Amino acid sequence: MDIEDRQVLQEPAQIGRTRIFSLFEIISAQKLLVVILIFATLLRVGSALYQGNAVIDLPGIYDQISYDELARRVISGFGFSFATGHWPATRAGEPTAHWSYLYTLYLAVVYVLFGSKPIVARIIQAVIAGVLHPWLSWRIGKRVFGPVTGLVSASLSALYIYFFYYAGGLITETYYIIGILWSIDVAFRLVSQAKKSGRTGISGSYRWRLWIELGIAIGVTVLLRQVILLFLPFLFLWLWWNMSKDTSIPNQSYSLLKRFRWSALRGFFVTVFVILLLIAPVTIHNLRAFHTFVLVNTNSGFAFFWGNHPIYGTHFVGLLPTGAQDYYNLIPKELLPLNEAELDRALLNKGLQFVFDDPMRFVLLSLSRTEEFFKFWPSPQSSLISNISRVGSFGVLLPFMLYGLWISVKLIWKPKNSEHRSEIILLYLFICIYTTIHLISWALIRYRLPVDAVLLIFAAYGLIDLGKRIQFLRKYLPSY
């Protein structure tokens, strides 16, 4: 726990003076946070127990069947392969890089240690998520909008139906969201410590540790889902722009080097080196398996090809009627003899050709994905669990997310809030860039969940603001 955390936890009286929730007046911030983490963990463990020891097709988490089979194949000595033909177009016994190596190994390790019992992997994941996810939401919310918002943000993350439902599923979403929040938290700490270093004499070694931690956070996140790579240039650009001057640079040369923010550039090299170190084993494995370069996974080409296929016209459909077979039939037959890596690359080229052939259709198709990506209403095609999760989480909190975004814009333009302006902008960047990535490729509700994790911070800020306004209005309401 860093210095700022201890300062916040030692100021429960300040939280009580907000007079928004009387509970804050009798329970310290530290105790309240612990209660939130315990409750979040219980909800997620409950979800894990509900999903049980059987690995079956449940709404939104069908991929757990693939991960479970892959893990069992790995510990049986067959490597990353399937016994029969498998999604997306992997032949029996042939290597696959379509699925997260890291998550597969997580399941394999659990199965080796505790036997092939999926429920154990579910419970371990639920406990980790129950602690880390709300805790990171608290840290980010507290840093950007204050300690009360941090606590409300942690509470919303704990109660969000999607999050505790997916925490019990054997898929990458839960750890992936934690990895994204961890990366954002480290980025915030880096900029904060860089700004303080000149004033407080914070050691440079601490800052280097943060650059290394950022590399680990991003590396783990990439190994869970490589799509986050597309956000990294924007994250690094934000870091580069917001790093303050490096006091180690001599005064006579500072004016030139300041423009390049030399301290940030050096840090980037360290972070990128750590990332490459983490993903290198995967890249080397892929080279040996497919005899061609694959950085992490073989799924971007499949997703972009299927997501932009002319079969949709200008209106995207989340899932085609007969599922996997429909998608398989869309692959040109002359490409099917290729191995998975070669096929992924060929399909990416085909998908790009769809865009070049009809750019306007691509634009309209991308816009049509907003309906699927931001769906908050019940659907007759969805199961009861899906509809309850959708309406009871995103549907209920969407107005507060939008309100929080709206009022946070005003903070950016207030000079007295300049300290947190850059942090709010990074959250905006993530929401916009990550959403755009999926609108131009493949949009499903579960792909939106990392965005939800950030939007909940704005929802918390909006709720706090509304609480203050309601309290203010009470003074002018007649009493009976």
Residue map of PLM features:
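Membrane-interface transmembrane helices that cradle and orient dolichyl/undecaprenyl
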Residues: 183-213, 240-251, 463-466
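Membrane-interface anchor segments at the N-terminal boundary of transmembrane helices
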Residues: 120-123, 127, 346-347, 353-431
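Loop-to-helix entry region of an early transmembrane alpha helix in multi-pass inner-membrane enzymes
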Residues: 97, 101-108, 114-132, 154, ...
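Transmembrane-helix signature of polytopic, membrane-embedded enzymes
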Residues: 119, 131-159, 177-178, 204, ...
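Membrane-proximal stem/loop segments at transmembrane-domain junctions that anchor or position
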Residues: 293-368
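Start-transfer (signal-anchor) and selected internal transmembrane alpha helices
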Residues: 1-49, 244, 256-274, 423, ...
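Transmembrane-helix motifs of polytopic, lipid-linked glycan transferases
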Residues: 123-145, 182, 186, 399-403
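Multi-pass, polyprenyl lipid-linked donor-dependent membrane glycosyltransferases
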Residues: 121-128, 152-190, 208, 220-234, ...
